[in-house]
Regions:
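Short, surface-exposed amphipathic charged segments that create phosphate/polyanion-binding patches used
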Residues: 42-45, 96-106, 280-285
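Conserved thiamine diphosphate
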Residues: 73-92, 261-263
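Short helix-loop-beta junction
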Residues: 12-26, 77, 166-172
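Short beta->alpha junction loops
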Residues: 28-33, 86-90
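Redox- and metal-dependent alpha/beta enzyme cores, enriched for Fe-S-associated oxidoreductases
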Residues: 1-22, 35-40
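Active-site cofactor/cluster-binding pocket
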Residues: 34-39, 47-50, 54-65, 142-152, ...
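Flexible inter-domain linker/hinge segments
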Residues: 92-145, 324-343
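Extended, charge-rich low-complexity interaction segments
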Residues: 53-72, 108-126, 208, 296
């Protein structure tokens, strides 16, 4: 039983577990006050033996969180006596993924389930966290999932918002974007999580397994595990000034090994050089965006190039033909200078 932001993720997880034979369900609370005991009891089948109530709050000094206490009260006035436990999710703005929800059901199925637990954070002080199986990922096989690593001010986030707009305006596909920033005003880490699908998207969380990963600042290869969330056989695009021979010298061995072990298709493009030569300065976004459309095949390549150039005309037409031409050249150069690297 839950309400609010986590219910779409819970529903998605319940449907996946049901496909695999698990007998689990969800009650979404849409109207909290006045709380309707009658409607709650009618919504829960008589055969239910165990219930986990998830609240997105921590009520200090209380015997439990608000929704949990209301559910307890509802059943105390009835002749039904299921085991009811409480949990918290989404605290500290932490993501709640399907793997977290599965851990709630796994805990509920135990002989002595943990009560007043927490999901989404690692609680090493009071040890209320549940064990999470990170290998549990939901993929319908039709959604293209993309992660873009960027640097604040390099245009990556703006380009990704534009990609969403291009696909939304020109196709029947559904598009979703989540953007994550660090605390710096500029030149800080940015991460863009994009999903594209022919079906409505109900994944209200960051991508845990991507089909495509792009990294704009080459320095990140030594700072982050860039392909940790890239699926087996996925595509990795690196914007770099290094030649193919120099890559082995600069990219850490663990990253190269991960690329090889997961059979990742590795591509590079010197977006910085292209942007400088066409007159765009440090703004590499158009080059990376073009490379994304070519490699991901979210759209047919010819259509993607046409839509990109149409969006350039629409966005920069008022600034003069020179600006439009620079961006169009960046698109053309990107399609010519993509390079596949064998690891």
């Amino acid at each position: 039983i839950a309400m609010g932001s986590g219910t779409d993720t819970i529903q998605q997880t319940v449907e996946e577990l049901n496909k695999n034979g698990r007998k689990v369900g969800l009650v979404k609370v849409h109207l909290y006050r006045p709380f309707s005991t009658k409607h709650l009891l009618e919504a829960i089948p008589e055969t239910v033996e165990r219930i986990a109530v998830l609240d997105r709050t921590k009520e200090k000094g209380s015997a439990g969180e608000p929704l949990y206490l209301d559910v307890l009260e509802a059943f105390s006035d009835s002749d039904r006596n299921p085991k009811i436990i409480a949990g918290r999710y989404g605290l500290g703005q932490k993501d709640t993924r399907p793997a977290h929800i599965k851990s709630v059901f796994d805990n509920l199925a135990k002989d002595n389930p943990k009560n007043h637990f927490t999901v989404g954070i690692i609680d090493d002080v009071t040890n209320t966290s549940l064990e999470v199986d990170d290998s549990f990922v939901i993929n319908d096989g039709q959604t293209t999932r993309c992660i873009f690593w960027g640097n604040g001010g390099d245009g990556t986030v703006g380009a990704n918002k534009n990609a969403i707009k291009i696909i939304g305006d020109n196709t029947d596909m559904f598009a979703q974007g989540y953007f994550d920033y660090d605390a710096k005003k500029s030149n800080g880490l940015t991460m863009s999580h994009l999903r594209f699908s022919p079906n409505p998207i109900h994944a209200a969380y960051f991508i845990d397994e991507a089909d495509f990963v792009s990294c704009s600042p080459q320095a990140y290869v030594r700072q982050y595990d860039l392909v940790k969330n890239l699926k087996e056989g996925g595509i990795f695009l690196l914007n770099t000034i290094w030649s193919e021979e120099e890559l082995e010298e600069h990219i850490p061995n663990y990253l190269l090994k991960e690329i090889a072990d997961k059979n990742i298709k590795f591509y590079t493009v010197n977006a910085s050089k292209i942007a400088q030569e066409v007159g765009l300065g440090h703004r590499t976004n158009m080059v990376i965006q073009t490379a994304f459309f070519i490699l991901s095949e979210v759209l047919p390549i010819d259509d993607a190039i046409k839509y990109l150039k149409d969006s350039i005309e629409k966005s920069y037409g008022m600034k003069g033909q020179d600006i439009v031409d620079m961006n169009n050249k960046a698109v053309d150069r990107a399609s010519e200078e993509l390079q596949e690297i064998k690891v």
